[in-house]
Amino acid sequence: MWKVLAIIGTSNSGKTSTVEYLVTNLVKKGLTIGSAKHVHHPDFSIDLDGKDTWRHANAGAKRVVCLSEDEVAIIRKEKGPEYKLKDILNLFQDEEFDLIILEGFHWIVSNRREVIKIVTAKDEEDAKKRLNGTIPPILAITGKISNILRGKSIQKIPIIDLKDEGVQLLDLVLKQVL
């Protein structure tokens, strides 16, 4: 089973920037990374209204596979069940990965000891709310909070600024993965 790192936090707290930073730098170090993002918008679709793939699905296809020279996309039209961690990880079963990074999914990962976590927050209150009910391991807190409380910690968890201290966060992740 793969190592799993979850980046959890409220909307606009810095989750995607954190994922982007980590994926970029972990790949540079030679690691193979998979990622999954929770989308909480009920009307979200990756497909575009009127495009050919949309037309396939609109006609009733349960699964639409798009293939080009450089990319494969699989669109499954289904009402999502109450996803579990294993359901998400099963989506990666056809390949080997050094690390799976999850963005969001707090309700799935917050009480899982086997999932490494990084919390993103806007401010101290936001961080404390997210930390409440989230069990270790929690490597760090990052995101917009680092503009306010850079170099500090909350509940002995370091607050790391990605711009100036990103290497520190990367090292913490590498120690857990390797």
Language model segments and positions:
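N-terminal phosphate/diphosphate-binding loop that engages ATP/GTP or pyrophosphate donors
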Residues: 23-80
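Phosphate-binding/switch loop-helix module in NTP-utilizing enzymes
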Residues: 76-107
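Post-Walker A alpha-helix
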Residues: 18-19
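Conserved lysine of the Walker
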Residues: 15
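P-loop (Walker A) phosphate-binding loop of NTP-binding proteins
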Residues: 10
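Walker A (P-loop) ATP-phosphate-binding motif of ABC ATPase nucleotide-binding domains
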Residues: 4
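Phosphate/Mg2+-binding loops and adjacent switch elements
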Residues: 99-158, 163-177
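Hydrophobic anchor at the beta1->P-loop junction of P-loop NTPases
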Residues: 7
